[in-house]
């Protein structure tokens, strides 16, 4: 859940990188990054369908190599809730920075285009610091979430 007092400054995108919104991206690149982050990968067809049915997704790419270094996908019911999925960033010393870039931009878009929606995220532990830095609260007021996996 996102706190009300989260007016952070936009993290600077490093030189040589570009942040794109809903630009065609290979599901293989997303799965490769998920794997490098020790996250579950998705069946290519299901991931393609998820991208198609998302409200938007953000990709952070190195310009010269077109390597995917950050990703998040957003869905919403367009009324009450917006959800961040598959929040990942290239492992290494810049991982938190890359994550902060995609999280900040996702929040900015949600606030502008889906005002009033509460924002939730299912994310790995490594993302806790960037999420907190962008105003997320861990289990506010004792609220716990659950997920179902088949």
Task: Give, region by region, the residue ranges found by the protein language model.
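Short amphipathic alpha-helix that is part of the acyltransferase structural core
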Residues: 2-45, 142-145
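A conserved beta-strand-loop-helix scaffold within acyl/acetyltransferase catalytic domains
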Residues: 42-64, 68-88
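A short, internal acetyl-CoA/4′-phosphopantetheine-binding micro-motif in the GNAT/acyltransferase core
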Residues: 87-96
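Conserved acetyl-CoA-binding loop-helix of GNAT-fold acetyltransferases
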Residues: 95-109
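Beta-rich extracellular carbohydrate-active architectures
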Residues: 108-111, 136
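Conserved GNAT acetyl-CoA-binding A-motif
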Residues: 110-124
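Low-complexity, intrinsically disordered Gly/Pro/Thr-rich segments
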Residues: 121-136
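Active-site/acyl-donor-binding loops of N-acyltransferases
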Residues: 132-150
């Amino acid at each position: 859940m996102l706190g009300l007092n989260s007016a952070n400054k936009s993290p600077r995108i490093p030189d040589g990188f570009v942040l794109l919104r809903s630009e065609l991206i290979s599901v293989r690149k997303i799965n490769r990054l998920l794997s490098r982050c020790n996250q579950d990968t998705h069946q290519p067809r299901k991931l393609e369908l998820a991208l198609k049915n998302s409200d938007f997704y953000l990709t952070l790419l190195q310009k010269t190599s077109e390597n995917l270094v950050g990703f998040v996908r957003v869905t919403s019911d367009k009324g009450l809730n917006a959800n961040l999925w598959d929040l990942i960033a290239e492992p290494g010393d810049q991982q938190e920075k890359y994550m902060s870039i995609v999280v900040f931009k996702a929040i900015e878009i949600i606030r502008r285009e889906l005002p009033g929606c509460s924002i939730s995220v299912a994310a790995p532990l490594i993302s806790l610091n960037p999420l907190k830095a962008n105003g997320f609260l861990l289990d506010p007021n004792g609220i716990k979430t659950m997920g179902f996996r088949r």
